[in-house]
Amino acid sequence: MIVGIGSDLIDIRRVEKALERHGERFTHRVFTEVERVKSDRRRMRAASYAKRFAAKEACAKALGTGLAQGVFWRDMGVVNLPGGKPTMHLTGGAAERLNALIPAGHRPLIHLTITDDFPLAQAFVIIEAVSVE
């Protein structure tokens, strides 16, 4: 059963300006170490960061909190499964909120799709409660 849906659209140029203006102060405040390492290796660095930013916003919306109620930027990180498919790894307040959404006898499954087509980056998140039986 679907317990949360979120989407976000961001202008890559906005992230590009934040990177130019604030550099590591911005990246260390918003992104996990895994995300920073991956994005910093990309040729289209700003687009990579923008997709991850959009994914965090979409995830926060799917959790039903936005970036409030104990959910912080670095509590949500984009990670890739062994086959390369992106998903979200949640910690801290985001993980607590996720667990509160999931009914007994179920486990959470987070679906993520991210894309970019300059000047836009977009993400969709669906949180599903899957029966453990």
UniProtKB/Swiss-Prot annotation:
Gene3D superfamilies: 4'-phosphopantetheinyl transferase domain (3.90.470.20). It is found in: Cytoplasm. It catalyses: apo-[ACP] + CoA = holo-[ACP] + adenosine 3',5'-bisphosphate + H(+). One of its GO terms (biological process) is fatty acid biosynthetic process. Its EC number is 2.7.8.7. Mg(2+) binds at D8, E57. GO terms for molecular function: holo-[acyl-carrier-protein] synthase activity; magnesium ion binding. The keyword Transferase applies. Its cofactor is Mg(2+). GO terms for cellular component: cytoplasm. Keywords: Cytoplasm, Fatty acid biosynthesis, Fatty acid metabolism, Lipid biosynthesis, Lipid metabolism, Magnesium, Metal-binding, Transferase. Pfam families: ACPS. InterPro entries: 4-PPantetheinyl_Trfase_dom, 4-PPantetheinyl_Trfase_dom_sf, ACPS, Ppantetheine-prot_Trfase_dom. Belongs to the P-Pant transferase superfamily. AcpS family. This is Holo-[acyl-carrier-protein] synthase. It comes from Chelativorans sp. (strain BNC1).
